[in-house]
Regions:
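Bacterial lipoprotein signal-peptidase II cleavage site
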Residues: 19-29
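N-terminal export and membrane-targeting signals
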Residues: 1-11
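Segments of small-molecule ligand-sensing domains
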Residues: 333-342, 354-428, 433
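Extracellular/periplasmic periplasmic-binding protein-like sensory domains
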Residues: 178-180, 275-346, 358, 450-458
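Extracytoplasmic "Venus flytrap"
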Residues: 43-65, 69-90, 112-118, 206-215, ...
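Beta-alpha junction/loop-to-helix N-cap segments that form part of ligand/metal-binding clefts
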Residues: 54, 80-87, 98-171, 236-246, ...
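Extracytoplasmic ligand/sensor domains, especially the bilobed periplasmic-binding protein
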Residues: 53, 133-235, 284-308
Length: 460
């Protein structure tokens, strides 16, 4: 049941948020463009954004509202409250609604459902049958309802926090990143080890589910292809929720491990961190899905020097983008915390509105889907590396751990930070004004990046 969050730990935790070719625009300014060969499409602006055209037969739309449904894993045994995804959506909607909405209509969350972690498919089916929303937002480790979304009639525009392999191949489902590669061999961990001077690495994973073992195998393969450090300890047979890691830590201490990459959940990383402290092993972790200031502060003594990389520009890299400042402001107005999961809600709410602006005042669900699928550089106003929706709905996995660059993204970037005194701090090597560390040489580069490109995708 924990498979998605485990797999994504390997895919996105360090410099592997997108499979593809590293970009060459060092300024990072990427205009939104249109699929070659199609009529140009641009966002509606000015007075047209206020134009209220009566729409007949468009599901979830009235003369004064655009209704959306939200599905999250509220009853979630993994660390992190997925219901906070809705907070980011609501914050963005509040900002747009205060400006008068779009096309004379307010954006409204009309349904909020908890899929109970294991009931995603049934919850999706119920929402599709009963909520009659214009669009759906989903954040759940298990996306078993993906095929129901893909086969919905009318096609349901759906926006997810993408940590799910079920995302791939469904053109009406959009995410904060494109389709992820769950088997590609990446430069991320080897580059991290090299840049930080680590030479001895450990990899930990559960024996079941298979995704955890695959994650560990991918991490190990990365160091075999790019041998910046040696994997001196490897255990992919841990038990789910294993409470005692004393044997593993003792073995790692004997091997002189400096960096630990894990394919386990957040709760397990804390168990590991406490055991590291108990045995006085001065090793740091690569932490998946842990960009949460409260988690870092509450466990400051255990995670000093560990690394975290959200799927967006970390707020520690200044100056902040205008949309980052807006996110902080409008989350504050909701009296909600600023951290990783709500930020994905904000990004995807922005993407919905972007799609509406592309579709125009006479919008429909299908027009919104078609419009977004012409966008070759959606970057959420700079918060994420640009997504090419003409390519990145497709699974980028190639044979033998390679990436199919015909359908992968252009950039291999992450916005990695480290934990110091219970706070996230930027890496020293990143120049002021840049927010992302990007690999060079392409997704299938035969050699490890020597000098990365430091990029910023939004305005300075």
């Amino acid at each position: 049941m924990r498979s998605r969050i485990l797999a994504v730990g390997a895919v996105i935790a360090l410099l592997t948020v997108a499979c593809g070719n590293a970009g060459s625009d060092k300024n990072g300014s990427v205009p939104q463009t249109t699929k070659p060969g199609t009529p140009p499409i641009t966002e509606v602006t000015g007075a047209d954004l206020k134009k209220n055209v009566p729409l007949s037969g468009v599901q979830g739309v009235t003369d004064d509202e655009i209704k959306v449904a939200v599905i999250t894993a509220g009853s979630n045994p993994l660390a992190g409250d997925y219901t906070t995804y809705k907070d980011g959506i609501q914050a963005y909607f509040n900002m747009i609604n205060e400006q008068g909405g779009i096309y004379g209509r307010k954006l409204v969350i009309s349904s909020d459902r908890n899929d109970g972690f294991v009931n995603n498919q049934q919850t999706v089916k119920t929402s599709l049958a009963q909520d009659h929303a214009f669009a759906t937002f989903i954040a759940s480790p298990l996306f078993y309802g993906a095929n129901d979304i893909a086969n919905s009639k009318p096609q349901m525009p759906t926006f997810i926090w993408n940590i799910n392999q079920e995302f791939a191949g469904k053109p009406n489902i959009f995410g904060n990143v494109g389709a992820l590669c769950f088997s590609c061999t990446g430069q991320g961990l080897p580059y991290l080890a090299k840049s930080q001077g680590f030479t001895k690495v450990a990899v930990l994973a559960y024996g079941s589910p298979a995704a955890s073992k695959n994650c560990a195998a991918g991490a190990k393969a990365g160091f075999e292809k790019y041998p910046s450090a040696q994997v001196v300890y490897f255990d992919d047979n841990m038990r789910l929720g294993q409470p005692d890691l004393s044997a593993q830590v003792s073995a790692m201490k004997d091997k002189g491990v400096q960096l630990i990459t894990t394919c386990v959940d957040q709760a397990e990383t804390l168990i590991l961190a406490k055991e590291l402290a108990k045995q006085h092993l001065d090793a740091v972790q690569n932490l998946p899905n842990s960009y949460d200031p409260k988690f870092a502060a509450d466990n400051a003594q255990y995670f000093e020097g560990s690394f975290v990389a959200p799927q967006f520009a970390s707020f520690e890299y200044k100056p902040l983008l205008p949309t980052q400042e807006q996110f902080i402001e409008w989350m504050g107005k909701l009296n909600k915390r600023v951290f990783e999961i709500p930020a994905y809600g904000w990004i995807n709410a922005l993407q919905l509105v972007h799609g509406l602006k592309l579709a125009g005042p006479e919008f429909s669900q299908q027009k919104l889907i078609d419009s977004l699928n012409q966008d070759t550089a959606f970057d959420a106003e700079g918060m994420i590396p640009p997504i090419d929706w003409t390519r990145q709905h497709n699974d980028p996995a190639g044979p033998n751990g390679t990436t199919n660059t015909e359908v992968s993204g252009k950039y291999i970037c992450a916005s990695t930070v480290t934990i110091h005194d219970g706070k996230f701090v930027p890496l020293d090597d990143v120049p002021e004004g840049k927010q992302f560390i990007c690999m060079t040489g392409g997704a299938n580069s035969p050699t490890l990046t020597e000098t990365p490109e430091y990029m910023r995708f939004g305005p300075s």
